[in-house]
Design a protein with these regions (language model features):
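Cytosolic-side transmembrane-helix boundaries in multi-pass membrane proteins
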Residues: 1-38, 235-249, 311, 320-359
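Transmembrane helix-bundle core of multi-pass membrane transporters
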Residues: 149-222, 331-335
Length: 359
């Protein structure tokens, strides 16, 4: 009888472990295990453990909002937002115009957000209108919308009448530079706010709090009447339409919200790195964000805030740690090559995997 009880307990424990593994997702367990292995190996190959933790947290804080921008369109049934560069361009316009108008310090960051917002709303409305016309092929069209908008802006960055000596080419006095320093403007405006420094460990508290506010806002919005209607449109548009929900309006709202979050996301990304990059820089920025949320357990039909947090941390952790550890192990300067292999490999995995959504 005792043996029977032990067997039952063992089965219960085994089932519990299997249930937890299924809930978290086997692919995520493997990636998390590999990331943990990299963290453990770091001190043994000469990489400072706390510095690597800091780098991972910093990269998470810079990229999390752009991954969060995926959530509204997934909920409304528009799929993954491969047109993220539209929102990024809105943010870049806000950033450059804020500097052009002479704003400095934290005020330049606030003004960049305010200026970027109408651009995001206008571009998001046009983008949403287009996606409503081609239902079923949103992700393919979104990809080309993103690529073409970046190429178009390559011309506009040269032609738009900017005059700030901080941004324009020195020899011509017109056309924006490829890279613009944010020193004296909003460099580290969030990362330096309430920053915690303990030895080599540095935690960008301000950036994490800013993301937390936006993430909570998104969670709260999805639980409102409008957010519930948006989710219903994504789950079953026919039922939503029968219930009196304007399907096209909900889809357009999700696109506008996603575009606005992308604009905010690139501004946070810039303040972390300390500079603005124009021209072809936004070209492939949608892919890491798409991959991160998929690795986090989302699908093209379902996504949660937990998917955003877990996916961003895993993706950025692997991209940060793999080059550092491998470079120290083989004692060759191949960090950039390894970084590209790791990041593109993660993107390839995320875009080709077929699994059910996890919590």
């Amino acid at each position: 009888m005792n043996e029977t009880l032990v067997d039952r307990n063992n089965i219960t424990l085994r089932d519990r472990v299997k249930s937890m593994a299924a809930s978290f997702g086997l692919p995520r367990l493997i990636i998390a295990g590999f990331l943990l292995l990299l963290f453990i190996a770091a001190p043994f190959v000469g990489a400072d453990f706390w510095t690597q933790i800091s780098n991972t947290i910093n990269r998470f804080s810079w990229n999390a909002i752009m991954v969060l921008a995926m959530v509204p369109m997934i909920h409304s049934g528009c799929g993954l937002n491969f047109g993220l560069p539209l929102g990024i361009i809105s943010g870049l316009l806000g950033a450059t115009l804020s500097i052009e108008f002479g704003f400095t310090g934290p005020l330049s960051f606030l003004m960049a957000i305010l200026i970027a917002t109408p651009f995001a709303v206008i571009l998001g409305t046009l983008y949403g209108w287009l996606l409503n016309k081609i239902k079923g092929g949103e992700m393919m069209i979104a990809t080309y919308v993103g690529f073409s908008s970046v190429s178009f802006m390559c011309m506009m960055w040269l032609l738009l009448p900017y005059h700030s000596p901080t941004m324009v080419w020195g020899f011509a006095g017109k056309g924006l530079r490829t890279t613009i320093s944010l020193e004296g403007f909003y460099d580290k405006v969030l990362a330096g706010f309430l920053q915690i420094n303990i030895g080599n460990l540095s935690i960008p508290t301000g950036t994490l709090l800013f993301f937390a506010v936006l993430a909570f806002g998104m969670w709260a919005f999805l639980h409102t009447k409008t957010g519930t209607a948006m989710t219903a449109v994504g789950s079953n548009p026919t039922f939503a339409r029968a219930a009196g929900v304007n399907v096209d309006k909900m889809r357009m709202l999700s696109v506008i919200l996603s575009t606005w979050l992308a604009a905010i996301g690139i501004l946070v990304y810039e303040q972390g790195f300390g500079f603005i990059q124009l021209y072809m820089a936004p070209f492939y920025m949608a892919l890491p964000a798409v991959s991160a949320i998929l690795i986090g357990g989302a699908t093209v039909n379902k996504a949660t805030i937990a998917n955003v947090i877990i996916g961003t941390f895993l993706f950025q952790g692997i991209v940060t740690m793999t080059p550092t550890v491998m470079n120290n192990m083989i004692h060759m300067d191949m960090s950039e090559v390894i970084r590209v292999v790791a990041s593109q490999g993660m993107i390839l995995y995320a875009l080709t995997r077929k699994t059910e959504a996890t919590k």
